[in-house]
């Protein structure tokens, strides 16, 4: 008779295999550790790229700081709210609980046309012998940011992606952001809600450190609570 533990391990292995088979490994290979700072920036750059490629923004790069002298559109107001929430989470004690970010684009999450998943894996190993680990923890530099933007842009323009995005200019679409963390992260801008995975094919992106001790695609974590950012992004006409 197979034990419950064996069944759980078997299910987890199936989940990992399924995750690996669907995961689009992001083609940026770094020579240093992927730390909490660079992970936050990657999520930020990825969200900017989605906004541009899906027509929410007319520019691929959004200013780091909100210009208080400028009257912002609803699109930019929501973007800066979401960006600030990410900053607060990634710079707080909650950052260790974050394991994934999911973005849905459509009229509502359950009726989304596109979905994207980004596993967040922060290495905290203290026994690494690689020179590129540990003390190299730092934010992305200009060269790294440009490389990420270039690769994201090339992927969004690829024939495979274009063939699946015939409705990408739909002005009724909205962009919804989910984050897997803990219920302690709930506040006025974040509420508990499970993302509607399975309704559409998801594109998976992994930010990888090529010399990391943790080889391969990170295994999905079973713990954590899915939460949704209350602000959502609309097209500029709204």
From Swiss-Prot:
Family matches, as InterPro entries: MAD2L1BP_domain_sf
Superkingdom, taxonomy of origin: Eukaryota
Protein's recorded name: Protein cmt-1
High-level lineage: Eukaryota, Metazoa, Ecdysozoa, Nematoda, Chromadorea
Gene that this polypeptide is encoded by: cmt-1
């Amino acid at each position: 008779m197979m034990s419950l533990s064996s069944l759980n391990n078997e299910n987890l292995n199936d989940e990992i295999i399924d995750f690996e088979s669907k995961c689009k490994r992001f083609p940026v290979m770094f020579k240093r550790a992927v730390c909490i700072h660079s992970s936050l920036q990657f999520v930020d750059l990825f969200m900017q790229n989605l906004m541009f490629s899906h027509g929410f923004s007319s520019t691929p790069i959004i200013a780091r700081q909100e210009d208080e002298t400028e009257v912002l559109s609803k699109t930019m107001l929501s973007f800066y709210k979401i960006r600030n929430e990410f900053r607060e989470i990634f710079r707080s004690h909650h950052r260790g609980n974050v394991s994934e970010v999911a973005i849905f684009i459509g009229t509502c999450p359950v009726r989304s046309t596109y979905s994207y998943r980004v596993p967040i894996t922060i290495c905290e190993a203290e026994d690494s012998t690689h020179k590129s680990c540990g003390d190299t923890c730092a934010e992305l530099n200009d060269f790294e940011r440009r490389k990420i933007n270039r690769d994201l842009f090339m992927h969004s323009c690829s024939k495979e992606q274009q063939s699946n995005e015939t409705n990408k200019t739909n002005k009724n679409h909205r962009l919804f952001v989910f984050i897997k963390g803990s219920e302690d992260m709930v506040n006025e801008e974040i509420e508990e809600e499970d993302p509607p995975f399975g309704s559409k094919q998801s594109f998976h992106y992994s930010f990888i450190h090529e010399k990391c001790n943790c080889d391969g695609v990170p295994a999905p974590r079973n713990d954590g609570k899915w939460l949704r950012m209350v602000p959502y992004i609309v097209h500029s006409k709204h």
